[in-house]
A protein has these predicted regions:
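Conserved SAM-binding loop of SAM-dependent methyltransferases across substrates and taxa
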Residues: 74-87
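A generic structural signal for ordered alpha-helices
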Residues: 3, 7, 26, 30-36, ...
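Flexible, active-site-adjacent loop/turn segments at secondary-structure boundaries
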Residues: 12-13, 36-37, 45-46, 74, ...
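Conserved beta-strand/loop positions that form the S-adenosyl-L-methionine
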Residues: 70-72
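S-adenosylmethionine
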Residues: 89-208
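Class I SAM-dependent transferase core
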Residues: 1-68, 83-84, 98-115
Length: 208
């Protein structure tokens, strides 16, 4: 695992007594992620800071309940959040078979009994009970992501999307979509200031 980033000091603070599970996940991803097409070759030197800890910053935002993660991929951030928040039930939604296989393997290997994995596209998911929150990281622009995820939410449920520096422009471009979807209390929160080198921007909105 040449070039694997050393664990930053912030890791223990973010994961607490779940840090060993986070370390195991990081080691598994560093060992197999590139060969299985889960992460690119340039990600190992920043796997902790850019991906795992960046994802973990969202954990305190989550409510106790059932959270769906759309486009779970390598588990960044769905598995990371499931490690950090054992009191929350997670439904990881991912359409690609090889990624689903990885997610299922890690759920079993890490003993995560608060995770279900669905192989499906978000628009094809039919849940018996609507979700309390839906998360997504690096999936698509808000104008496309909102129509895919709002049908999964209960009334009063919340979208929690990790976004980049252009999130304000995305919100402006998606203004009509946001109104049509019935979203209120739309805001952007900046997380991780003074904790990690790069802050995390989170788009939050509540379904009426």
């Amino acid at each position: 695992m040449t070039g694997f980033e050393q664990e930053p000091d912030a890791a223990v603070a973010l994961f607490g007594d779940r840090i060993e599970l986070a370390r195991r996940f990081a080691a598994d991803l560093a060992r197999e992620g590139e060969t299985r097409g889960l992460i690119g070759p340039l990600e190992l030197p920043r796997l902790w800071s850019r991906h795992i800890l960046n994802s973990a910053l969202v954990a305190p935002v989550l409510r106790v309940g059932v959270v769906g993660d759309v486009g779970s991929g390598a588990g960044l951030h769905g598995l990371v959040l499931a490690i950090a928040r054992p009191d929350v039930r997670f439904v990881l939604i991912e359409p690609m078979e090889r990624r689903v296989d990885w997610l299922l393997e890690e759920v079993q290997a890490l003993g995560l009994d608060n995770v279900d994995v669905l192989r499906a596209r978000a628009e094809d998911v039919r849940l018996a009970t609507p979700l309390d929150q839906v998360t997504a990281r690096a999936v698509s622009a808000l104008s496309k992501l909102i129509p895919l995820t709002v049908p999964l939410l209960r009334s009063g449920g919340e979208l929690v999307f990790m976004k980049g520096e252009r999130v304000d422009a995305e919100i402006e471009a998606a203004a009509k979509v946001i109104r049509k979807a019935g979203l209120v209390d739309v805001r952007v929160e900046v997380l991780g200031e003074g904790v990690l080198p790069e802050v995390t921007r989170v788009f939050r909105a509540t379904l009426r």
